[in-house]
Structure formats: structure tokens, C-alpha cells
Amino acid sequence: MSKSYKMKSKSYVCGEWVEGELNGTQVNNPVTGKIICTVSSAGVNFEKMTQYARTVGGLGLGEMTLHERANAIKNIAKYLLTKKDHLYQISSKTGATKLDSWVDIEGGLATMFSYSGIARREFANEKFIVE
């Protein structure tokens, strides 16, 4: 098996991008067999991640109103939309056609935009929902 390039995939952990400590598992292009990257969670402190999510991420979201959260989702979708050509390029390495990928990429982004709009239209601009 020839290799076109090899990179270590990173994970977003406790506010920063980190690589696993070991070489990890190879991720191969299913069409060509070439190595795309390696991925490893060795050395990642999952207990610390859970605590970070509860004390930093969760608190941060709790401070946002529902409209602010909806706008954050919309802004992420807008950013990802600027990267859609790159996302199609990556998706092609899975063996998917552009049409296959369209459902996941543009369909997923459309869902994000839709949920954002629904939240802003149907929920009060508060930090909570009264049911």
C-alpha cells in the first residue's frame, strides 16, 4: 500500500487541539488504500474532558440566551459553508460521490440554518424555556 501523506488527526480537548500520544490507528482511503491519517485517543484524559464540559462548556452555554445559541449555530453553519469545497474533497476520500456527499454536507448545513431560524422564531430570547 502506497501512502500519499500521513498526518495525525487531532481532537478538540479542553479548549485546545491535541494529538494522541501513540501513533494510533491508520485511516485509509477506501478507494485507493492510501493512508489518510492516524488517530489515537491515547493519553487523552476523558475524566478531565467531562469536567471541562460541565464547568466550562456547559456554564458558557448556560450564560447564553436561546437566540444567542441559535445565532452561534447559524455562525458555525456560515463558516462551514465557506469550507464546503474542502468538505467535498475530504468526503470523496470515503468513496462517496459528490451527490452522496451533498446530503451530508449541504443537507447538514441546511438543517443547522433551519434549527437556528426555528429557535429564533419560536423561543423567547431567554436563557431558559418554560414548559
Regions of interest found by a model, annotated:
Residues 1-131:
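N-terminal Rossmann-like NAD(P)+-binding subdomain of aldehyde/semialdehyde dehydrogenases
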